[in-house]
């Protein structure tokens, strides 16, 4: 019979094992958004931008980041050599002006990320064609060719989501990326129909009259976005079945007041009602491969409590990986509700890893991690991401394990062991062995 001492030791071992598993999960998405709309790259020049990105990627690698979501299409312009759209002003300062000396940031980033064992997801903004800060559109901007496909909303120019030809256009842009670049994912964020502004209404009367087919206008707008998400998903997987399609929606689906059955106990803007984004439907139908809701508030927020929302999303994760979008600035700016001498990172990470359906997180934004605000990067490096993690499994994309490598040998060098092997033969591009160590 097991004595009390042995039982106590066993319980202690099991507890330590469980804690270690929580701190070092085998599979976990550890992403970071690298955005261009904060003007961090504008006018830097080729060499300086490459130095900046190299430093950021090196630091993010030390912090255990295994996926980069790189913004390449902010407003119908491109940080890559697009076949459809002009070079971005966020790169050169003037929309339509190529970088000099010439280079392709997306191609360069893919190579740099893969060399560090990171995935690269090309992040595009599907409908936003011009923001307030853009004063002039290039002659090759799509609005110059087809102004009838767009509407103005305040100082924003939006491609009308209600027109079928607009869905086709965006899918053509994405197909161009897929055919020419070795991206691991296509990512879109929270900009669908525009965020509501006081005194403004969406000017889509003509489009609704033509395509509404008797539907309630709100339902029709949601269906427009649904059709786009489904078409983009099908487009991506038809061209490259292994490329992941992910979305990072606003952090509130619906408030309890609007939907007593599926709403969260919050009081804020809503995906479903205000942005016409039915995120739960996309997950249920399998139209997205992962979901990263932007839960950017703090624990204890009066209208959108982080604790409440992260639990809600975990309960509604469905059958697709759920990652949590984390706001680094807000996390380190807000005190822990129990210990005011600490910020909220520790409590947020503990909560995230304690919930059964959350398989990782994505940091908004990469530079805040690199700048180590509130020792955020240090804590990732030394504690939460101390050991590397594989990406979460997606069996609907690929459920077959790769074949074993052949003729594996080792060689000792002053930098440690080097491994050499012959890769297994693959029958298709999807099954070829590309391994980064």
Regions inferred by a protein language model and the residue ranges of each:
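Catalytic domains of carbohydrate-active enzymes, especially glycoside hydrolases
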Residues: 51-77
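Pro/Thr/Ser/Gly-rich low-complexity, intrinsically disordered linker/stalk tracts
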Residues: 382-428
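Active-site clefts of carbohydrate-active enzymes
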Residues: 247-266, 309, 313-345
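Conserved small/polar residues in nucleotide/adenosyl-binding loops
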Residues: 435-437
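Aromatic- and acidic-residue-enriched segments that line the glycan-binding/catalytic groove
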Residues: 78-92, 128-153, 191-212, 258-268
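Substrate-binding cleft of secreted/luminal carbohydrate-active enzymes
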Residues: 279, 287-300, 320-394
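Active-site-adjacent "subsite" loops/lids of carbohydrate-active enzymes
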Residues: 35, 39-44, 127-176, 180, ...
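Active-site neighborhood of glycoside hydrolase catalytic domains
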Residues: 173, 180, 185, 192-264, ...
């Amino acid at each position: 019979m097991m004595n009390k001492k042995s039982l106590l030791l066993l319980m202690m071992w099991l507890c330590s094992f469980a804690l270690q598993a929580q701190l070092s999960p085998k599979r976990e998405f550890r992403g970071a958004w690298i955005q261009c709309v904060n003007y961090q790259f504008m006018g830097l020049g080729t060499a300086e931008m490459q130095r900046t990105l190299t430093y950021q990627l090196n630091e993010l690698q030390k912090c255990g980041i295994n996926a980069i979501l790189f913004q390449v299409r902010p407003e119908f312009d491109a940080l890559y050599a697009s076949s459809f759209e002009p070079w971005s002003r966020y790169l050169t300062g003037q929309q339509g002006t190529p970088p000099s000396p010439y280079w392709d940031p997306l191609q360069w980033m893919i190579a740099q990320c893969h060399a560090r064992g990171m995935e690269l997801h090309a992040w595009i903004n599907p409908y936003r064609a011009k923001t307030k800060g853009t004063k002039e559109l290039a002659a090759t901007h799509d609005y110059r060719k087809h102004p009838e496909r767009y509407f103005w909303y305040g100082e924003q120019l939006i491609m009308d989501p209600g027109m079928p030809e607009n869905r086709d256009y965006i899918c053509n842009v994405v197909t161009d990326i897929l055919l020419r670049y070795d991206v691991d994912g296509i990512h879109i964020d929270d900009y669908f129909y525009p965020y509501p502004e006081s005194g403004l209404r969406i000017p889509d009367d003509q489009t609704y009259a033509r395509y509404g087919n008797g539907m309630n206008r709100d339902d029709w707008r949601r269906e427009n976005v649904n059709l786009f998400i489904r078409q983009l998903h099908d487009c991506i997987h038809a061209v490259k079945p292994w490329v992941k399609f992910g979305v990072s929606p606003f952090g509130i689906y619906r408030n309890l007041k609007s939907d007593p059955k599926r709403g969260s106990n919050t009081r804020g803007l809503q995906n479903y009602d205000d942005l016409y984004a039915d995120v739960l439907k996309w997950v249920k139908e399998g139209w997205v491969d992962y979901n990263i809701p932007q839960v950017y508030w703090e624990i204890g927020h009066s209208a959108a409590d982080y604790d409440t929302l992260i639990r809600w999303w975990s309960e509604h994760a469905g059958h697709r990986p759920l990652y949590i979008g984390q706001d680094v600035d807000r996390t380190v700016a807000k005190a822990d509700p129990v210990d005011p001498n600490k910020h909220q990172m520790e409590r947020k990470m503990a909560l995230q890893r304690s919930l059964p359906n959350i398989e990782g997180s994505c940091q908004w934004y990469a530079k805040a991690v690199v700048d180590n605000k509130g020792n955020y990067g240090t804590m990732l490096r030394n504690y939460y991401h101390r050991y590397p993690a594989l990406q979460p499994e997606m069996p609907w994309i690929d459920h077959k394990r790769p074949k074993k490598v052949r003729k594996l040998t080792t060689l000792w060098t002053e930098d440690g062991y080097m491994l050499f092997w012959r890769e297994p033969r693959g029958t298709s591009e999807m099954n070829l062995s590309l391994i980064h160590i």
